[in-house]
Amino acid sequence: MVDMDRISISLPTNLLAEFDDIIAERGYASRSEAIRDSIRDYLIKHKWIHSLEGSRAGTISIIYDHHSTDVMEKLTTIQHDYEKIIVATIHMHLDHDHCMEVVLVRGDASNIKELTDKLTSQKGVKQVKLTVMVPGGNIPQ
């Protein structure tokens, strides 16, 4: 039998309600099993991102609550710190509270990963998605 640790987490009510709907839809035996599955997916994504090497081009998509204290200023400051790999940014208003930025990047994968991690860790950032490709047409036939 696998050793188990019991943990406690705090979640916004609406986030938990949406998660519970997915649990029911997918037929999980328990909330714990669904959380374990979600953590596994997160670990796989993290390992994939951190295994990238070499020159890459891609996008970092960010959704954030623009009312969150200083989030826009912090995101801008971070982006200025990585001006050598940022090619362009696109800003879009999603609704009254949320904005989306798409940051086009090109450079060494380690710098892209570092930028993604810094953006992800900011308070007020709701979601970050990194998509990368190998530049220069080095795509297998």
UniProtKB/Swiss-Prot annotation:
It comes from the Archaea. Ni(2+) binds at H80, H91, H93, C99. This is Putative nickel-responsive regulator. SUPFAM superfamilies: ACT-like, Ribbon-helix-helix. The keyword Transcription regulation applies. Belongs to the transcriptional regulatory CopG/NikR family. It comes from Methanococcus vannielii (strain ATCC 35089 / DSM 1224 / JCM 13029 / OCM 148 / SB). The keyword Iron does not apply. Coiled coil: none annotated. InterPro entries: Acetolactate_synth/TF_NikR_C, ACT-like_dom_sf, Arc_rbn_hlx_hlx, CopG, CopG/NikR_regulator, Ni_resp_reg_NikR, Ribbon_hlx_hlx, TF_NikR_Ni-bd_C. Binds 1 nickel ion per subunit. Transcriptional regulator. Keywords: DNA-binding, Metal-binding, Nickel, Transcription, Transcription regulation. One of its GO terms (biological process) is response to nickel cation. GO terms for molecular function: DNA binding; DNA-binding transcription factor activity; nickel cation binding. Its cofactor is Ni(2+). Pfam families: NikR_C (PF08753), RHH_1 (PF01402). PANTHER family: NICKEL-RESPONSIVE REGULATOR.
